[in-house]
């Protein structure tokens, strides 16, 4: 291998016109970009061969290089710092730009052939210095296969690393395994030592010392190149058996625990045409976009460790997407009763070693390479986040991009053996002469990226790629994502603030409240547009059609109007409000339009759903059953600001709050359906709360709770109730207003602008059926009787001035007028704070028969001179869902609530960073 082929040497020596004393000089530069880069392109034995041919070889001193400088000197190299004498300079990785020397021939891995942005400054400097650059990556044979590469050693090191990582991960899951005795590849002096450690681990496996509860371990190798072969060399030292991909399912369940199983995956094993499920290799090469991968369904569910050695090209199917990872991390129910000290794996797929280190490639969620210093991370698919700990939920990931540097001596010798036959002709390169005058072999000539200050013909495409990328970057910077926010009420502030953190989002705010829009425009970079939804449909439609997303913060009755405009323009939409029957009627139209409309993203509904689904899904994963679910939530004034007859204040329009008590409600209690009629009788359903006793709370059922048995997937629950929390006394006061007819949404002509103004005394006289001219005492007496002799309710009416001469606001209905009046009397002052109180209670029956009583509490206070608690807890989850849609994190289409992990998982995780933190407690009854 060290002797160059005689015909090639004869040809090269014939080209050497200079005398022996003018022979070219070669230099081995030291690696100085990465602390772990201890390799060299040639080993001492190669230097010895070159010096025997009469060439001078300079060795730049390096204490980092794994092979000692003395070894190179013994081989005939000359140790010196100054390498300007050399015409050929060899390295492994790129040199710093400031150390490049003009009109020299350099050979190294430049990582420029795809116009990689990180190395374009290097390429510019190479061109400026008129350097002839030979890139090892492009030294290929007539079939296009690489001749010079470290691939095999990347596979060897990667496999050793992931076995070590699996030992750590399995220990975190409660299992000691023989893999715990393996270290990282660089901890071994050479691969022989590492292999011996693997053999020792394999011996323990063959003795049956693997934990039974984790089942047989399966390893899947993608690709058939040097990377995969190197990884398999290490794997073969274990007691292993190779099976076909279609056999994985069976061996993953019933395989022998005294061995591990492997399969080598080729394209035909998982790629199929979308139309008929057939694989045609010729067609795939031409039209990869016609194909999809079945890896996620046919192979990944039965894989313990994936060793990926393939690169991803645009338009080709990925091996695994983010959504695939979510489904793969769902635990499979076991028929075996779990033992506390011997748990089963939470999911089959434990680890991925992505030796390709291709970020955003065939493994979609591998977005950043790990390093030798920090080799592992965990991808939590539910939360769609990456964290460094080997504990917690997720898949262990290892994606080091310089793996061969962990076994530097053997990697150097291996690489040098392949490079050595071409070194002498590279030595004859004169960078000052035209490339055409050089007598290079095709292998070397076709690897020359630059020469004489220009890109060579074969690589002129790099400049076009750069220009194309720069255009795309410019367009992406100039083409912002457009969001239309409808409504400028209390909730809009947190929504606008959260979205404004991303400079790539352009926000338009549509509202008919000019003053509020102006105030918000001063705080946030938004485009204010005057718009009255419901009366300006054409203007709404023209606004919507230019957007990427619409957020409706309007009253719920207007959401269908907005949704229709979104359907027409095929624009996604989110809202915090309930998915009403009117919205539900649009479900088919939403599906036909292929858009996403997400509702119930606020607090209640919203965060209550998300917490419920997270708890319920977790219980199901454990094989448990949810027997009861009770959730109460309320927006309240802070206790120090609750001194009024309602014990309540309004942070937005009171209409919805008032009308809520007029609605019927139904819930399930101990297996029986309880129906509550709205209006006067709702007071009978009010219950005092025994938690947070210092707050003196009461609660009442909210609308139809029973339907959530199906939505939440807990049809077996005997108790299911969703309710509203208030301070004690609120319900009684509101009940009085119902008796007086003040909570009535029917049209009331006497309150319209064209009618004569009315005082509250006059309106109340009309409502109780006496003359408007009746004296105050008479009205008070009749009202007292109407209220059933309840002094508390009478005092509430008097406190609000309903028996006085204050003018009634103009409105379409009595409840609208009453709402405006309440806003004037019971709005929050500039220094007053609100609070949110929510409690979710679950009864969870575990497979052991134990009953777990679990509570989740949320208490949030408004900020002094900042956002209210209600605005934060409604606006932030809505804004987060909107951002997730814009960023492509939510791919599902249709009308939906936040009932899937894809939606609730990231929101519940991210909202913690905003200071909204939940407190969870559990007690177990034996």
From Swiss-Prot:
It is found in: Mitochondrion. This is Alpha-aminoadipic semialdehyde synthase, mitochondrial. The N-terminal and the C-terminal domains contain respectively the lysine ketoglutarate reductase and saccharopine dehydrogenase activity. Residues 477-926 are annotated as: Saccharopine dehydrogenase. Transmembrane segments: none annotated. It catalyses: L-saccharopine + NADP(+) + H2O = L-lysine + 2-oxoglutarate + NADPH + H(+); L-saccharopine + NAD(+) + H2O = (S)-2-amino-6-oxohexanoate + L-glutamate + NADH + H(+). Residues 28-455 are annotated as: Lysine-ketoglutarate reductase. One of its GO terms (cellular component) is mitochondrion. The gene is Aass. The keyword Metal-binding does not apply. The modification N6-succinyllysine is found at residues 93, 138, 274, 286, 333, 458, 523, 535, 584, 732, 761. The modification N6-acetyllysine is found at residues 48, 52, 56, 93, 128, 138, 286, 458, 523, 535, 584, 707, 739, 761, 778, 780. InterPro entries: AASS, AlaDH/PNT_N, AlaDH/PNT_NAD(H)-bd, NAD(P)-bd_dom_sf, Sacchrp_dh-like_C, Sacchrp_dh_NADP-bd. Residues 1-27 form a transit peptide. Induction: Induced by starvation.
